[in-house]
Each structure stands twice: as C-alpha cells, then as structure tokens.
Amino acid sequence: MTYRTDQATDLDTTRVGDTTTVSGWVSRRRDHGGVAFVDLRDATGLVQVVADPEEIQIVDELRMEYCIKVTGVVQERPEGTVNHEMLTGEIEIHANEVVILSPSKPLPFMLDDRSEIEERIRLRYRYLDLRRPHMAANLQARSRLTGAIRRTLDELGFLEVETPTLIRSTPEGARDMLVPSRLRQGNFYALPQSPQLFKQLLMIGGVERYFQIARCYRDEDFRSDRQLEFTQLDLEGSFWTQEDVLVTVEAVLKAAAREIRDVDLTDPFPRLTWQEAMDRFGSDKPDIRFGMEIVVLDDLFEDTEFGVFSGALDGGGTIRGINVGSRELSRAQADGLVDRAKELGAKGLVWIQVSEDGSLRSPVAKFLSDDEQSGLISRLEASLGDVLLIAADRWKTVSQVLGGLRLDLGRPNTQDELAFLWVTGFPMFEEEDDGTRTFSHHPFTSPVSIDEMVSDPDRAISQAYDAVLNGVELGSGSIRIHDPAVQRQVFEVLGIDEETAERRFGWFLEALEYGTPPHGGFAFGIDRLAMVLQGEDSIRDVIPFPKTQTGVDPMTEAPAEVDETQLKELGIQIRAEVIAAREEAGE
Amino acid sequence: MTYRTDQATDLDTTRVGDTTTVSGWVSRRRDHGGVAFVDLRDATGLVQVVADPEEIQIVDELRMEYCIKVTGVVQERPEGTVNHEMLTGEIEIHANEVVILSPSKPLPFMLDDRSEIEERIRLRYRYLDLRRPHMAANLQARSRLTGAIRRTLDELGFLEVETPTLIRSTPEGARDMLVPSRLRQGNFYALPQSPQLFKQLLMIGGVERYFQIARCYRDEDFRSDRQLEFTQLDLEGSFWTQEDVLVTVEAVLKAAAREIRDVDLTDPFPRLTWQEAMDRFGSDKPDIRFGMEIVVLDDLFEDTEFGVFSGALDGGGTIRGINVGSRELSRAQADGLVDRAKELGAKGLVWIQVSEDGSLRSPVAKFLSDDEQSGLISRLEASLGDVLLIAADRWKTVSQVLGGLRLDLGRPNTQDELAFLWVTGFPMFEEEDDGTRTFSHHPFTSPVSIDEMVSDPDRAISQAYDAVLNGVELGSGSIRIHDPAVQRQVFEVLGIDEETAERRFGWFLEALEYGTPPHGGFAFGIDRLAMVLQGEDSIRDVIPFPKTQTGVDPMTEAPAEVDETQLKELGIQIRAEVIAAREEAGE
C-alpha cells in the first residue's frame, strides 16, 4: 500500500508523462465539458486532477474535503488554461484511479481565508480551521521561528535544559495554577509562571548558558491577549552584564526576523530608558514606527493666565502636547477625543487646530496669549491643518493620556514594518493600587545601586529591561541578585519579614550561599512574537489549540467535571456552595 | 565590568604571554613552596591559576567552590609539571588580580564523581550535584540529544507544533493529574498523559508531519524509573504505513546515537514480532545483546516419565529451557535460582549442570532417560560446566520465568553496546487482573484486521509496535484508526457503550467524520533514551530537577500546603479526613 509517490508541489513540467500517486483533500471541484476538475490539496499546496466520471465513477461521489488518493499521469495543461498563480499551474494529473480514503460530512464553514467566521465556531472545529491557508502558514511559521531561535542559541553555546513544571508555589505577580498531590493529600504542586528560580539554580549549578522554550502558566483574568498557558523563550547566562544579555537577545530576534520576514534588522536596537520612553511616548512599550512625540510645554506656560494650565503647574504637574498631524476635526470628533482622554484618566483635554489662515481654532484659544499661541506652533512644529492635543496634569496622567491618544491616532494598522527597541532602567519598585510597594519586575532583580535602593526605594532604578516590538512588550529580563544579603534586603524593602522570607524562599536563599555567579537573563513570549511577525491581531491565531477568553476549549469542552472518586483519591472535594450554585443553575 | 575574556579551555600554549581574565569556581587548591595553585573550573573545564599569597592576600581566603574572577598572564608550565590528563595541562595563569565574586559555605558533599552520596541529599542540593562532572555531562548530552532529534525531523520536513497541556481528561491507562479551574469552579483541566488526540487532530487538520518534544504527566504509583512528569518525543504522519513510521524513528535514533555515542547504527533495526520476542526471549522488550535464547523442549519430553514435565504437557503447557553458560553452581546458588523462579511466577525450576565427566548433575537427573539427557545437551548446545534451566508450565508463565532468569544471569552491566530492535504485531487487547478486556496500546490503535478483531478479539493483532534498546522499552506507536465506524467498533469490543463513548469521545468521533487521512505515529521517552545513551542506571540522573519516588522535591519541598483563600478561589477544599489525619500526625 502506497499513499503517495509525490507531494502536490513536487510536480511540474519536468515530470510530464510520469505516472504519479498523490493523496490529499478535495479543495475544489468543477465540472466542465463532461470532465471533472478537482483541486487536490496536501500539506505542500494544490495540484489539479482531471477525471472523466464516465471512466471513474467514484468521481461523482467526491465532495468538499473528502480525503482521496489519485493515481494518474502528469500532463501539460492545454494552452490558455495555465494558471500562473498556482505553483503547479502548468500541469495537471489525468487520473487513472481515484480512491476515497475518508469521506467528509458537509463543512460547518468554508475553508478559504475570505470567510469571516465567529471565533467560537472556529475553535469548536479547530481541526478544520487549521486547514485554512493562513492558519496552516501560521503553524509553519511558528515551527520555523522556534527552529531559528534554537539554532541561534545552539551556535552561541547555550544548553537547552528542561526545568520542572510541577513545582512549589512562588509569588511572581499572578495567581498560580495548582495541581493536587495524590501521594501527599492536602498538598499541592503549582504550575510555573516561569522557570525563574530554576534557571537561577542552573546558574548556581554551573551551566553558564541556559535556554528553554518553556510552557508557562498564569491564572489571570483573561484579557484579549492572554492565555492560561503560554510559551516563552527563557534564557540565562552567568558572568554576564546587561550588555551580554541584550546582545544575545538581539541575535535571537534578528534570526527570527530573518527566518519569518526575510529581513536583516540593524543592530544594536534603539535603546530608551524607561524615563525617556515615558516622557517621549507616554508608554513603557512605545511604538516607535511613527512620531507624534510628546513635547514638554511647562516653560511656555509658566506665566499663563489660562487657569487649567497654571493650576496644573502650581500643583506640581506638567503641561505636554502632541501634534497628531493634519486631519479633519469636526466638533463631534473633538468631543470624542476629549472623552477618550477622560477614559485614559485625564480630567480634560485641550485640542487646537491650526486654521487655514494660521489662527488657532480651539475653545481655549481666547485664553492663550499671542506668545503662547506662536510658541505652541513652533514647539509642536505645527503646519496648517495640524491638530494639537495638550494635557495638563500630574506627570503620570499626562504621559498616560497623551501616550494613549498617540497610539489611537498614529498607530499603523499593519505589522509590515518591524520596530524593535529596548527599554532599560526601570524603577525597582512600584506602588500597588492599595498603596503598598511591590516589585516592578520580580523580587530577584538586582538594583543599580544597593545604597539607593535602601535609602530611597521609590526612586531606585533596577537592572531590568524590556524588549518591545511595534508597541508590544515581547518580554523582559534583568541582572539578578547573586548575593544572599542583597536578596534579603530586597525582601525587607518589599515588606517581607525575615520569617516569611525564610519560610517561602529559605531553600533559595540557601542556594545563593554556595558560590553563586553573577548572572542575568531574559524571557520573551513566543506567542506574541509569532503574532506580530505573522501580522495577526490575536495570539489565538498563532496558537494551535488556544482557549477562549474564559479559559474554555469549545472543542473538547475542557475544563470539565470529573468523577468524585478521582477527587477523593486526591484528598479534595468541591465546596458545598459551588455544588449548590450548580444545582440552582439546573445542571 | 568584564567577567571574562576567555573560557578556561580556550587557553593553550599559543596564548603564552597573553593577559587573560577568567571566571569560575575554585575546584581545588593546593599550596606548594609558598605559592597557591588553584584549579579554576568553568563550564568548559579546568585551568590552573598560580598566585602568590604574599602579593595577592585574598588568595588565602579562597575555599572550595568560591566563585572567583582571575586576571593574569598565560605561561607555560615548568618542565615536569605538565599534566597530560588536563586539556589545559600545558599552561597555567600567573595571577595579577583575584576577585571573590561570591564566597561559598562549606559543601554538604564533595563534588567529584567518586563520592557516593545518598540521593536525597543530592536532590536537596541539586544545584551543587549538577556541578559534578558526570552530571554536567548528562545535562550537555541531553541538550545535544534533543538538538539532534530536532535537526533530523526538521530535515525530514516535520513541523514542531505545541499542543495544549490544560486539556480534558482522557483515559489512557494511568491516572490523570488534575488542575482546578478558577473561572469554572467545580471543573477541572487534566494534564496530558500524551498529546495523543491532539496530534491526531493535527493530522485531521492537514499538518501531515508533526513532532513535539512534549512534557507529559502520569500519576502512577512510582516505580524506580517513573516520574510524575516526563518528556517524550511525539511524532505523527499522515498517509503513512507502519514502514514509514519505523523508517522515520530509525533515522531519529540513528542521529541520537551518532550525536551522543559517535556510532553509526546499522539500519534497518532487527524486527521481531511480539510472539517471537516472547518465545525466544521471554519478554516483549528483549535485551538482544546476549544469547541464552529460550528453547522449546516439548517434543523431547512427550513420552517422559518425569511427572512435572508430563503434567505440564498434559495440562496444555509447555517445557522450555535456557543454557546460562558455564558457571559455578553451589547448592545454595541453585536454591537461589529456584527461589527467584518462584518470585517470577513459577511453581518450580529444574536446574542441570553438565559435569566434568559429561553426566548431568541435577536433583531430577534420575528421572530423565538417557535419550532425554542427551537430547537436552544437544538441544541446548551444552558444553562441560554449562548450567541449564528448565521450566514447565503455561506458556505465559514459562516465558516470564525464563525471560526473567535470562536477564538476571546474562544481562551486561554496562550500556557500552547499543542493541536497538522493533517489536511488532502486538495483541490488540489484553486481560486485566479482574478479567475484563482492555487495550494493549491505546484505544485509537488500528487492528490488522477488523473482521478478526470483531470475531476473535482476544487473538486479534494490532498495528502497534515498540522500539526497544538494551532491554528498555523506549517507546511505542501504532497506525491509528481513521474511520469513525471502526473507532466505534473498538469501543464496543472494549465494552464502552455507545452513550459513554459519545459522552467521553463524541467530539473526537465527530472530528473523524471530516475527511480524516490514514495516519500513524510514535512516541518515545527522552529520559529513558538519554539514560541508556549516557550509561546511567536511573532516569533521575538525566533529569535536571527530578522528584523522588514519592513525588517530592527535597530542595523546595514541593508539593506543599497552600493558603485556604487560594483553594476557595478555585472552589475546592481539602477533605475533612485529610485535615483530621494531618492534625493527628501533629503537623
């Protein structure tokens, strides 16, 4: 039994006259002049099969997506029927035998790229969705992407090491997913949010250059671009400075862009400190494919009579603006911008348009002096028709508002251009909503200065850095703490008392005591990188079998109920209130 | 700040006179003639540092495994002190500066390969254990092994596709590990025992050639070579016959052996049917590095007067023997063999030694006729001193007993030779201890003949096959069922009624309805392959961070108790009896 002698796209005019056997799916079928033309699709592409239903009766049974085997002779297509858009468009197979390997029920949706199908239906029939050309291309690209990453790191002398996924719960900013233990009832493993501590242990273990393409887990409330499980490239090196990390990650990202986009990126990538990124782009993950940079206007308005501006300055705030270019701005559109600014946290927004006659059209124009008006035009390099947006508030709010409006109004809607950059010098700590201090990156990140961290923690800068692509945070890394005394100090600044630190991290603090090398590393999301490189809007389109935003697989209906006996073996039970709620819902 | 200009083994006599900076660990330190000799170890190996403590006082502080940075000049070693067993044995670094990067506490055990350390202690300090040369070599080998596997499959046009690890519970012969869902309280994900159904879905999705190095999970009661989580190479192809699978896996295993052992294996590998393997070696995973094959003796004893033999034959059993070669056999040793046979399930064991004078020494010799005695010698090709072991019982018991004794007495105690083979033609079903019928491989395996499967299921042969290396089952595979009607028939033979099949597998049976290609595949354990190739006795020595046999990580003490609030969010609680037992134990 042979299913095939050739793949579809192996066939071309050099093979004319050869007998061939191909297997694949019926992608299209037309009848013309008593003869059937079947586009047979396999993993490589399409080839046209010509069959006479009078000779081969089974051809009349063929329907869309039937899986078939065809034996026949390769022939040149008759003049005028050559299809130049098809790789095999110069030939066709004249069938001698057609075998139906598997029939197909009528399809729930068409398998071309043009159909817009509800995502839940696509996921319910993911195995059909994956036959669509752009989804098949996404799977292929992802495989090539991880291949290129591995080759690059292999050449750089990295070891791929598998770290455990049934670990002890560690606090990394999101909820752990738990796995009850059967042999130690009442105890739980956690699924890793990242291999962070294990890769640091590998450094202590003398590995020096580690990487892993690792499955990680975060039980966050779903946002559009999050999944319960995701994949990250995780890497770490010993005797490394920040420069070593950045150069290595650049080599990996260059290889990725070359493999998937066939472009050679210029290195080193642009670098911005976190402060610069916030000041110029109002974001710690700026999209630098376009300008509209934020301009400081404080000095221009230091004597202003316009109360909103003077009030902001008096309150220790700042006045900043962006020029969003020449565009139509109806009153309704202007109101829309103000509403959006409020959504982003502003109390209001000043909009100004440079009219045809050079005067400023704005509800606040009358409050601004001539000097202020001309200063605005020159500072924001405004031309006729340009729209200027100005916010006055605390620095954080102004940055957030102008950064958000900048993206709304300027962001390209394709991913054709690739703009990578580094953001460095992140603050060591940040404030939680409840006012408590927490780590910005994770609690194993090294401060730039230990003294500064202790004396003025809220202004302390860490040795952490992010890689950003087209406004998407690809990943982050840092130089780690390798001195157990410093690690204890960081816990202290975070308000973790000694006893708690010992209970939760004692084993790790002990490991640091045995000649830990200085080390640092990085991790970035494969899903997000693949998404941008493939020009997709959703990570779900580059994940073979994703979950919905509520963590459900519509195909298998996971998660599901399980037998009570299984739970009993694990020493757990479902809480009474959950069962009651389920019964009430009539399940 | 530069930690190093060179790795230890970059340095040789061509570098004499160069100033170099190296970083690593103090592997050994001797003092001789007022000068300190420090073996500095990094990931590449060792280099000797010479320092004068009078000039560089810090040298006196150096202890084992301190992490240090040394700057100095490369010099040839004085005549008579060259060390030919060391890659850098012709040179040494004369230190100008030594910096302690991290001190180390005194070690809990010596880091050489000679020390025998209790495994629990090794795992408690795994980060130190990994610094030992053979453990470092195991990590490196494993990375090279998966690299070679990936390169091979990449060249063969396979896509690496990541399948989900939070799935719906499926029955594959072992217990699932469960993950409670927070967004759907009272529901659970399962961790996959293998990517089986998802890889079949990829075939339905048109991928045609898939592989993945996949983390899998089995909550089995621990045996010496099992872990809760393990890694397998998982592959699948469409339009494939058994031959296609075997050729592909052979290519992968050949690449693995070449990479790790630098040997070129002859292909195709030997193939035995399951029946042959059981008959000749008494095992479905025979170690064929040595003979001692099982010989059928039924016809020799068809008229025997020895009751044990005639009784076995009359009861439908069989008489078989092995020649375990010339060896000392005291009465106590012989009794030991009989005891071992009983452990293996025999009621007794006949032992015979060919004495110096050619007569047979055996408690049963007197019951055997001259013809039977000479027949035994000729059938078992016995020479002077040879020990013959004979079992008479049901076929299954005889195979088990002689197969077990054969391994005890013949198995080489190194893994120097690599003997791969295929076992094919496994039975479709087998009997569970309680007499019910279950699948031998998994319920998605195709029978050789559907008619036979329905008419005589207990004798039906499947299209399943195992790869065996030196008596270790590396993995198994099969041609799958691609016809939903056949899949339903298999469920029926397994006693799974239609409603249950629909409830548990309805989504998969539906997927099979959409033009499923014929397909088959394979999976083998990376841990076991790495173990044999590295000549280790335990898979734990090739897993970076394994668990103990009770599923515990002695380093982090996972699994651990978690906060009640975390459990509440997940809608679960620990059962009262578990809490009571814990309190009783005084925890």
Model-based region annotation:
Chain A
Residues 1-587:
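Class II aminoacyl-tRNA synthetase catalytic cores and aaRS-like
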